[in-house]
From Swiss-Prot:
Its biological purpose: Protein modifier that is covalently attached to lysine residues of substrate proteins, thereby targeting them for proteasomal degradation. The tagging system is termed pupylation.
UniProt-annotated stretches for the region ARC ATPase binding: 21-59
Comp. bias regions, Polar residues: 22-34
GO biological process, one term: proteasomal protein catabolic process
Record-listed cross-link Isoglutamyl lysine isopeptide (Gln-Lys) (interchain with K-? in acceptor proteins), residues: Q65
UniProt pathway: Protein degradation; proteasomal Pup-dependent pathway
Subunit structure of this chain's protein: Strongly interacts with the proteasome-associated ATPase ARC through a hydrophobic interface; the interacting region of Pup lies in its C-terminal half. There is one Pup binding site per ARC hexamer ring.
Protein keywords: Isopeptide bond, Ubl conjugation pathway
Source organism (scientific name): Corynebacterium urealyticum (strain ATCC 43042 / DSM 7109)
PTM section of the record: Is modified by deamidation of its C-terminal glutamine to glutamate by the deamidase Dop, a prerequisite to the subsequent pupylation process.
Deamidated glutamine: residues carrying this PTM: Q65
Protein name: Prokaryotic ubiquitin-like protein Pup
Membrane-traversing stretches: none
MF terms in GO: proteasome binding; protein tag activity
Amino acid sequence: MANAQQQVFGGGGGDDAENNDAPQQGSGTQQVNVTGTDDLLDEIDGLLETNAEEFVRSYVQKGGQ
């Protein structure tokens, strides 16, 4: 059998630098969404602590939507 040689080429440094910036920008946007979600969940928790029975009745009347 003949010996096979394999060549491996590395990517250019410029492309890698651009790709590293993109996930960081996306992470910032994702953090904003999580913060909004946390605020909404805190509001729901507060409502349930004060008047859970009314919340459940209103949820059932709307058909769970």
